[in-house]
């Protein structure tokens, strides 16, 4: 038989060693025996015994030989017994180096798994490509060390239980040796269920839950376990490319960020928290890890996605399906918490959406703390000396799901997931080109930095712990936003939404966009390659055309030159793209509104400016992320630095403020924020004569009806603010203002709140007029230039 390759780690050094051979076929045993013969030849004075490792879930009788070998003083050698070394060994089979994408898919068929070839296939491999067979040895351990671990970590006492423990440790050691050869992307937790059920820690917690049984806990662990396989790992990239085939095949990464994350993941386990705009995100993260040869992630997903053949396949690719609404099931909550802790303790990486669900508006939602609290508990309990929270920004040039989101905004119901839904989803990806997918990895947040050392004060103070979790989660989300590149799609959509259906020419689009690009360059904000191309007329044309045909822009080219506009029915879809770039213009938009407010203020206009800036921040806090108050004030001051002696000019007021705003480039508040305050104002108008404790559904229905009336009357600029999604946060604002609870002065405060919002909308009108004057002046100047030519 042709000799296989041996891994460098597959060398025996101890004088008395028991080799546990994990084999599935006689061919593998022959290879291991050949390797063992080489070891005996190198160390003629050493004693190497070999025993076939019992398979998982082997009957008690299969463990008899191992039980005997583990008995103290079993062998005659003086070094035998407790000082004897245990070394697990197996043969791994590598896939062909030139395997195609079709070959990876074919591996799903019976008998085609390249990692587990049949005996006949193994003999053929050894004849034709023996380098694909490799003998590997796991890390060795002394019997005494294993016995001490067994006593410290399990509740078992029988010597047969010890043999099972040694078998599990051997398989885990082999798994580690295997992924060192195959690559970090194949790293996955093994034997989770038997390890956890045998754990003294787990069983002690189980005893504290009334009515809990080991059997029920085991079933829940089966539901959570991933059942990872190498073939499924290979399929991750194939399925990922299939689901994202409408995009450029290569994802856009920042190589410096990838290198920094690789170094961080070598030191600590991590939770990858990604922004969530599309179902595609679920494949983007695993593919991104594979693309960059990084350890895989075990991604949490709703059990509603575990349907048909996709459920088992996604499980074997690392998806952990969790139930929803688990508040009344203490056993499930406990098992899930311990499962998360176990995975973290074993230094595997987890991943889920920091927002908990897809953002159907295009902007980031507030972070959800449920799973995060379980990870924090594992850290505070000392299961890791630190855990990194690695943000992941995922953004797209375009998404086909915006049509669905626009329907949600108008009040439509969510389409249930299923095989038909999956077919339609994948089919839609191939209908046209959606541009690029941008993946960014900002600097990770250290859990130790926010929660202190393990076993610290937060373990005894739930309120302080929750506050620390909130601050930590918001910091992750903030870093995600700061790393998210501004796209051409977002900028073009934002501009065309401001025209309220009036079409713009290519020259008008091009010269108006330059102010925004200049601002982003001054701020050193990250921008996509598509946004960089907006510097040229050709880049603007390409961006506008990519959005045309109702996606969501309409192009008219039946006249002298093409023009582009957004029709009323497409405003909700376009708003998704606009909302994805608001974070880059949020503070400068607030500056404009605060200046407009100060123009009409009595007394100290500088104080009025700052008071209004902080008030706007407070009103918008449910829709957007902000820096803390101190940093926010510093950012606003920096935004005003474009105008020399701005406080002096602001204090004068009147025409000085007009001049300040006219000189400001760009003016973005109307484009970015108006729609949110219009939605707030609609809800405030509904509250005028609504019951004190009006429910969310009733409030939304009334707001939809009133909003449609306002659109018909021209009392709002477009149909965009008439959105169930915006009304949901508008209600949060009202609750925060204590306007949805019985009170003696409730009616007066509701009227006052509506008046405040109308005054803010008046400020929008003021800034918008100045922006229009800027546009007209640019048009006049451009026309003069063309006339000279």
Curated annotation (Swiss-Prot):
Entry's localization field: Cell membrane
Keyword Repeat in record: no
Enzyme Commission number: 2.3.1.15
Major localization listed first in the record, in broad terms: membrane
Entries under InterPro entries matching the protein: GPAT/DHAPAT, GPAT/DHAPAT_C, GPAT/DHAPAT_LPLAT, GPAT_PlsB, Plipid/glycerol_acylTrfase
GO molecular function, one term: glycerol-3-phosphate O-acyltransferase activity
Reactions it catalyzes: sn-glycerol 3-phosphate + an acyl-CoA = a 1-acyl-sn-glycero-3-phosphate + CoA
Pathway linked to the protein: Phospholipid metabolism; CDP-diacylglycerol biosynthesis; CDP-diacylglycerol from sn-glycerol 3-phosphate: step 1/3
Record-level GO BP terms: CDP-diacylglycerol biosynthetic process
UniProt keyword list: Acyltransferase, Cell membrane, Lipid biosynthesis, Lipid metabolism, Membrane, Phospholipid biosynthesis, Phospholipid metabolism, Transferase
GO cellular component: plasma membrane
Placement of sequence motif HXXXXD motif: 275-280
Topology of this chain in the membrane: Peripheral membrane protein
PANTHER family found in the cross-reference section: DIHYDROXYACETONE PHOSPHATE ACYLTRANSFERASE, GLYCEROL-3-PHOSPHATE ACYLTRANSFERASE
Domain text: The HXXXXD motif is essential for acyltransferase activity and may constitute the binding site for the phosphate moiety of the glycerol-3-phosphate.
HAMAP family (alphabetical): Glyc3P_acyltrans
Family to which this protein belongs: Belongs to the GPAT/DAPAT family.
Protein name: Glycerol-3-phosphate acyltransferase
Species assigned in the record: Mycobacterium bovis (strain BCG / Pasteur 1173P2)
